Every structure is written in structure tokens, then in C-alpha cells.
Amino acid sequence: MEQFLKGLPKVELHAHLNGSLGIKSLCDLGERLYGTSCKDFLKLCAHFSRFEKDMDACFEKFAFVHELTSTREGLRFATELAIRDFAEDNVQYVEMRTTPKANENYSRRDYLQIVIDAIKAASETYPEITVKLLPSINRAEPVDVAEETVSLAVELARAHPNLILGIDLSGNPGKGRFSDFAPILAQARDKGLKLAIHCAEIENPSEVKEMLHFGMSRCGHGTFLTPEDIGQLKQRNIAIECCLTSNVKSGTVPSLEEHHLKRIMEADAPKVICTDDSGVFDTTLTKEFLIAAETFGLTREQCIDLTLEAVHHSFASEQEQIQMADRVGNYADILVK
């Protein structure tokens, strides 16, 4: 099964840039920035690979990667390395999310432009993978920062219409209020951007109700969705982005066997398997499919169907979706023969 899943041309719809650098890529990035003998960097790498079942500890790990990407060179190289990691896992399409940041080395506009340029450069090196960009709103940051992010996303989407396709709302779910960001998200939607919203990542029924009423293009995590919530999403054909390893390692799900993917499959609601932060959680999309297959008894045919479901729920153009589905279909045909 693992070899089959490795060869499957997969589709990744929930991947955060700064969390998607594997240990090898982190070491490559650290070597590029600091050389091979930096003891502080090696110590940080060792800490990064340890894990506690605690969501706050997960978010603390991002501070390490943010430091590595705090320069133009670091950000550019990190973007290319993340794409390399997905390409090596035979991911044919990825929608990468990242929160624009500002420091003494770049503005938020610069940040997005650096990432855009890196994506375009990587397309020459890794032509087999298509990369799209979803600028992220961090709900832990002030509303005016979110306003700037959406403004930049709308502007840059005009310049790069086939690259920036939507907006992501993410960040520590225990911080900020959705109601503060809803008007900004509505503006993005009115300008033609899709909305990928982290929803029900922690238990907060009133916020979930508010989010479902507001609407979204895809639902991130959906850990604490009720059967009624899942039914609403099914009725609206809104896919739930399921990140198994992430949810277990961050402590929001007790075990793989208790993961809500099972309930979603039983309800026959739209769902996609994703990594979330493949570097932080030491996983790959191949591993996530394998975990789902071993935990819930998925067949090869079901894994192919899940991949086609991801194609359908991607923000890609109709022509791109047809091309992706053809690659999956051709792979399935080869196996049958």
C-alpha cells in the first residue's frame, strides 16, 4: 500500500509554508544561512524534532521557523525547499498558505512578492508540481493587519490571477474572535477570492455556528463539528480538510482511531486528507494516506477516490482540475493493467 500511495499523484489542500519544512530541509536552510557548525541552530533543530501533545507548544515551534525565514534569502529558499519536499512526495498540486509578515528586512507586500517569485522559480526546477498561494490571516494578530493582508491579496491576485486563489483564516484558535474578521473575509469573497477557514479546531460551538452561517469554500480541521454541522457542510458540498497526525500530535484528538475522519466518511460528507504542517508534525501526504488506510481500512480505490475528491475541491481552474484528474486516472489505469 505504501508504494502505491507514494506513486499516487496526490493533491494537498491544507499546507502552511512555515510548517512544511522537513528536518532535512530545515538543515539545508540552516546550513545556507548559518553554515554547518552553528551550535545554536543544531540545538534548535533537536528541539524542533521533539514533540508534546499540546497545541500551544506546536505554535511555539513556528517561532523557530519564522526566525529562519526572517530574511529575504531565508524566506525565498524556505519556499523553494517546501515545494521540493512536496514534489519528492509525488504531490502534483499544493495550495500553500502563509501569513505575510513584516520586519526590518521586508514589508508584508515584500513578503508575498518573495514567496511568489520563489514559487515561480521552483516551477522551473519542479515542473511536475503546481503550486498556488493562499495568503493567511492570523486571528491572533490585530484586525488592521488582516485588512492589509486582504488588500495585498486582492491586489496581487490581479497581477497573478492563476497563483493567488484565496484567503486562509488560521492561527491559534484560542485567540481572537471570528466576528472581528468576518467583514474582512466578506470583502475578500466579494473580490472573488475563495475562503479556507480553520473551523472547529477546538471546542467552540457558538463560533462554529457563526462560521457556518457566514459560509466558506472549505473547512479546515473540523475536529469538533457535530453531526448536524457535518450535515450542513455536506448539503453545501463544502469539503472538510482532515489532518490526522496534526490533530493527534497537537492534542485535539486523543488517538488516530478516534479521529473525526471516520464520522465524516460515515456521513459521506466531502473530505480531503491533508498534512497541515508536514515538517512540524514529521509527516508527508503519503504517510497521511497510509495512516488513514491502516486506521480505517481504506482500499486503493478509496484512496484514489479521496484524491479525486481533493481535485474537485481544489481552487484550481476547471482545466487544471481536468488535467489533475487525468493524471490520477492514468495512474489507476496502469495499476489495473
From Swiss-Prot:
Binds 1 zinc ion per subunit. Keywords: Hydrolase, Metal-binding, Nucleotide metabolism, Zinc. N(6)-methyl-AMP binds at residues 16, 18, 66, 98-101, 171, 201, 276-277. The keyword Hydrolase applies. It holds the Pfam family A_deaminase. The active site is at 201 (proton donor). It comes from the Eukaryota. Zn(2+) binds at residues 14, 16, 198, 276. It catalyses: N(6)-methyl-AMP + H2O + H(+) = IMP + methylamine. InterPro entries: A_deaminase_dom, Ado/ade_deaminase, Metal_Hydrolase. GO terms for biological process: adenosine catabolic process; inosine biosynthetic process; nucleotide metabolic process. The record marks 221 as: Important for catalytic activity. GO terms for molecular function: adenosine deaminase activity; metal ion binding; N6-methyl-AMP deaminase activity. Its cofactor is Zn(2+). Its EC number is 3.5.4.-. It is an enzyme of class 3 (hydrolase). Belongs to the metallo-dependent hydrolases superfamily. Adenosine and AMP deaminases family. Catalyzes the hydrolysis of the free cytosolic methylated adenosine nucleotide N(6)-methyl-AMP (N6-mAMP) to produce inositol monophosphate (IMP) and methylamine. Is required for the catabolism of cytosolic N6-mAMP, which is derived from the degradation of mRNA containing N6-methylated adenine (m6A). Monomer. This is Adenosine deaminase-like protein.
